[in-house]
Amino acid sequence: MGSAEIGAATSSGSALYWQRVVKNGDVLPIDAQIELLNDAEARYVSRGGLKLEGALKQLGLSVTGSTCLDVGQSTGGFTDCLLQLGAARVVGVDVGFGQLHDKLRSDERVLCFERVNAREPGAIAAEIAKLLAGEEGLDADMDSDSDFGDDDSHEDDEFTPKNIADKATNTLASDIFEPDFAAEFDFIVGDLSFISQTLVLPAIAPLLKPNGCLVMLVKPQFELNFGQVGKGGIVREAALYEQVEKRVREAYAEQGLTVHAWLESPIQGGDGNREFFIHASK
């Protein structure tokens, strides 16, 4: 492998030396064995990006120029996919904290809301509104020399609008939204774990613009009752998959959404479970 190829591989994060090589300046032993990851797997910050890419291709959907909401953003695989496919901006929400990949946290097209429970009606719109209303004092409150993501002293901070923007980049809501943004999205995507999306749907369906698209990953093990899921969290009975589809479709109909497609994810879950995508619109 030539130096140019190694340089390109390390820049893209697709080279391994015991652990991922992330910078061309990383120093490796002269006899280091370089292993290249599958190019498809290295394209996004997580496998979720490949799942969403496959679903959007199968559905023939374009996100170019769209304002998108990513529910259950986590590392940001879906967000990464949306941006690479041409989305104008992505708002991500997650109940967790500090999971979003640095590549996305520093992207001016991304606004990350952490420690937000998307199940609560109005929670997402309220956080956007608070940030837009309160960001006049955001610059003064932020120390541009600090590293918010790596400072352990912030791990237990109460969630506030002023700690949403990444301190290293000082991304502001006004860089992404107009002041009168009504918290309506062209596209909503989501990858939720440990909660049924039927419980979250009533809170996110109102955020979809008329004729907007909703593409959600369905994980059957989180849509069934505890006793229905087998050892290791694996769903094995075909009848249970049918039950999940029926239950989820009914939940979408209750929210006034039209379901256009139900398709199997091109990539299985990391635990070996079959996963599905549902495509709906308002």
Positions of PLM-derived features:
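Conserved SAM-binding loop of SAM-dependent methyltransferases across substrates and taxa
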Residues: T75-G86
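A short glycine-rich, Lys/Arg-flanked "PGG" loop and its adjoining helix->strand segment in the class I
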Residues: T198-C213
